[in-house]
Amino acid sequence: MIRILSLNLIGLACGIGLYYDFQNRKHFKEVIDNNIPINGNNIITGTITCENTDIDNIFVHDRLPIPYSMSEDPFSLFELHGKNKIKFYDCDNYYYNDGLRQKYFKIGTVKYFDLWYIEDNFYVEKSNIKINGINLIYDKNLKIFYPKHDYHYLNSNKYLVRKHIPNNSNVTAFGKINKYGMIKIESIGDSYNVIDYVAEKYFGISDIYTSTLSFGLIISLFYLLK
């Protein structure tokens, strides 16, 4: 009886949660489709461009293993990944010596596992970035979603990832035009990730949350109908 009651309560809670989640997603879609401001900001789409200046035409030799020109793209993030090996011992077999009060392990198979980690990173941005010819302004909290990832394998233990927003490419930004005629943005990148960021931050919409509710409802129904 308690089991059935608990399953009913779990199923009811998940069902109600999914209903409100559906309504929330429906409302968010209407806001996006009608370009209704969200916290004073809007979804802005257009072509991102940048202009070369003397300070942008540099090469980075000191922190990256290979030279890269920084004059190509508005936003770039370089990540140098390294590899370490972790050693594990199979110590399942052991015996205990009562006299010495010590436990002796018989080492079995030795296994190695690769552990990749970010050894260094280097962020680069241009000094004059525009969307549809309008200057962008932003702060250090700008959320960037890089649509392009380039991989350069240096050797078996290192590789370099260049994440970037290409110059003269279509982008989506979340922001507003201020009184000075510039676009102040909070987030920029590909359309899917920017909209997903806005949905989660301002509407509480999360695919993980929806999946958890759906899983809970399915499990409760499965055991109730079993």
Curated annotation (Swiss-Prot):
Its main location: membrane. It is a single-pass membrane protein. GO terms for cellular component: membrane. This is Uncharacterized protein R401. The keyword Transmembrane applies. The chain crosses the membrane at residues 203-225. It is found in: Membrane. Keywords: Membrane, Transmembrane, Transmembrane helix.
